Amino acid sequence: MSENVKKNWIKTIMESMGSLKRTHFCDALRKEDIGKQVILMGWVLRRRDHGGVIFIDLRDRRGITQVVFNPEINPEVHAKAHSLRSEWVLAIKGTVSARPGDMANTKLGTGDIEILVDELVILNTSETPPFPLDEETEVSENLRLQYRYLDLRRPAMARNLLLRHKAVQAIRNYLNDNEFLDIETPMLTRSTPEGARDYLVPSRVSAGKFYALPQSPQLFKQLLMIAGMDRYYQIVKCFRDEDLRADRQPEFTQIDMELSFVDEEQIIEVTEGMIQTLFKETLDLDLTPPFAHITYADSMERFGCDRPDMRFGMELVNLTEIAKSCSFKVFRAIAEEGGTVRAINAKACAHFSRKDLDGLTEYAALFGAKGLAWVKMKADGEWQSPIAKFFSEEERASIAEALDAQEGDLLFFGADSEKVVFQVLGELRLEMARRLDLLDKKEFNFVWVTDFPLMEYDEKEDRYQSIHHPFTAPREEDLDLLETAPDKALSRAYDLVLNGTEIGGGSIRIHQRDVQARVLTALGIDKEEADEKFGFLLRALELGAPPHGGLAFGLDRLMMLITGSDSIRNVIAFPKTQKAACLLTEAPATVARKQLTELYLRPDWKE
């Protein structure tokens, strides 16, 4: 068939809906509806011919219904159905009928019924899609993102967006019921240092000046508390120009909250109620607050990180004191020079091959390990290890006791600075859990991490940096440390971690100007710079700012965990790639020279 003939043929078979009005979605009909006249609309998922009868799986975002074209019911409609192909758009009218007993499909909610069609309207045709839209076919992510509107027709993707809608609805309802006000804050604001790079927007009316897209509504929500709004929330887009990972996007959605006249316990209580409601509405799962708490220091000691996955054990054990007097010179030297020696016990893993161990050594090197010492526990406390000969029998027994090591266990050691050892063993612990299939995606383990340091020293910048942001309140008992040992001061911050992923965090804020000025000074921000960047906030703190605090949740990351997705991109309708590109629209893209000139920008490329 020539292209022109094909186009004319397609044009003749496409029709309008006319007087047809949809009565049901494709997931709705059951045995109780047998005998009803119904009208369904959707896409052709599959077409099958059996003995002259044509079967179509008709799909919409809700589900699938089998529709049947039988020449004995309507020969004209049956003849018309011969032309149907995948992804054509249909409207059908027919009668709900029971499927023959041996033809029922228990995998579908509509699997007990089918529609005997007596009217068919072809609303649109489709070229052959670039990939099958079933669940079984593996499709490259780049191709899916290029044709995202097709990818979103796939049932799993449609379910993700439906679940996201339910989540947002549940959050709004909960916060509205708890006296929160939904208030919008500006998208075009000024650039302020919050850690990551800002996305900058040049001003056309103010030559050489730029807006920044917000990394968070932090300052505006604090100003709303000073304005007396008392309880604020917003489900808001935020932007960060940073290197991307599987759980990061340049633009992301944040559940943002702020409350006045509260302390940490009250904010945590409100938040746990919201999470409890969210999981009930989306997964019909009953959570039981209060959630567990762990301090930052304890989390680092036990799990090597500040976002502990507590679904499994394999905790870090501190062997530094044993190492200070042990025979192994490498461990002893590191321990005596202020480093640390720690280990984890992978129970019943002594069967790991040398190839496995070499692979784990290479993995540990990615996080700064100069090597990876290991021990396989044999009968009677014997060690199988390249380092076994360097330890006395008593030393081996002490280490085995500290690690609760039994025959068949596999021990891994880290010896270096605390920073390196925590990262190496923390990541190795997670890698072992993945290899041993210890991470149950259907288990939801929540823990609050508290008592973070207020700031840490950045050697590259030669100044202190906030762990969270400069507006986090220090503990009252640590105020005097701001001038003498700011890295020793603890903050009134709290993060909520789910299955080893930080899903939200917040703090009590500074509400007194003198304290805010002292924190900025400790961060190396002098009065002139503070007035330039935060003068509006400092002035507001002088005009009756109430005690306040809040937190923010990453909605995308939370939905990734709720849906069990491997990537945050699977829960966002139109995500960017890890290079911050949109394969669908081909953004970012070049713009006309005239547009740049209007913005006082000089192009540096040749046309």
UniProtKB/Swiss-Prot annotation:
Q: Which UniProt keywords apply?
A: Aminoacyl-tRNA synthetase, ATP-binding, Cytoplasm, Ligase, Nucleotide-binding, Protein biosynthesis
* Gene Ontology MF terms in the entry: aspartate-tRNA ligase activity; aspartate-tRNA(Asn) ligase activity; ATP binding; nucleic acid binding
| Compartments in which it is found | Cytoplasm
Q: Which Gene3D superfamilies match?
A: Bira Bifunctional Protein, Domain 2 (3.30.930.10), GAD-like domain (3.30.1360.30), Nucleic acid-binding proteins (2.40.50.140)
- The answer to whether keyword Protein biosynthesis applies is yes
Q: InterPro entries, per this entry?
A: Aa-tRNA-synt_II, aa-tRNA-synth_II, aa-tRNA-synth_II/BPL/LPL, Asp-tRNA-ligase_1, Asp-tRNA-ligase_1_N, Asp/Asn-tRNA-synth_IIb, AspRS_core, GAD-like_sf
Cystines in this chain = none
Fetch the Pfam families from UniProt: GAD, tRNA-synt_2, tRNA_anti-codon
Top-level EC class as recorded in UniProt: ligase
**Record EC number:** 6.1.1.23
Q: Does the keyword Aminoacyl-tRNA synthetase apply?
A: yes
The protein's name: Aspartate--tRNA(Asp/Asn) ligase
Self-association and partners? Homodimer.
Q: Which organism is it from?
A: Desulfotalea psychrophila (strain LSv54 / DSM 12343)
Family note? Belongs to the class-II aminoacyl-tRNA synthetase family. Type 1 subfamily.
